[in-house]
Curated annotation (Swiss-Prot):
The gene is yajI. It holds the Pfam family DUF3251. A lipid is attached at residue 20 (S-diacylglycerol cysteine). It is a lipid-anchor. It comes from Escherichia coli (strain K12). This is Uncharacterized lipoprotein YajI.
Amino acid sequence: MNTNVFRLLLLGSLFSLSACVQQSEVRQMKHSVSTLNQEMTQLNQETVKITQQNRLNAKSSSGVYLLPGAKTPARLESQIGTLRMSLVNITPDADGTTLTLRIQGESNDPLPAFSGTVEYGQIQGTIDNFQEINVQNQLINAPASVLAPSDVDIPLQLKGISVDQLGFVRIHDIQPVMQ
């Protein structure tokens, strides 16, 4: 009888342990699915922004559009050659938004000193029928590069617009500067 009770307790313990293991695995699976859903949502949002950025640039006759949510570079044919531009380190500050405009030359030559114009603001409407609102601009200047291929990081402070409000950054009129 003692043996039967012991076997019964052992069998009950095994069922309890297997139920705990299954609950742990279920919790782990739910966490994995939740993480995957968040990542898919983020990828979908980035895909929409990349598509919007590509459409804006296809329609643009002057300059290149960069959308903060796209997290992907865009190319600009300029007077100093083909440039690859992107926005990095986008953060809020007391006066608006700070970010870095990364400009990369695509040739094997160093970039000359250059200037250009940066416009930024909000986009209202659809990509096919949009309006830029609250547009502000600032001039940028970059020194000549010594190395090739060249990367130039230009810190920008975009006053009066929060990270959430920032709909676009457009760079245009890139011209060499004589030193």
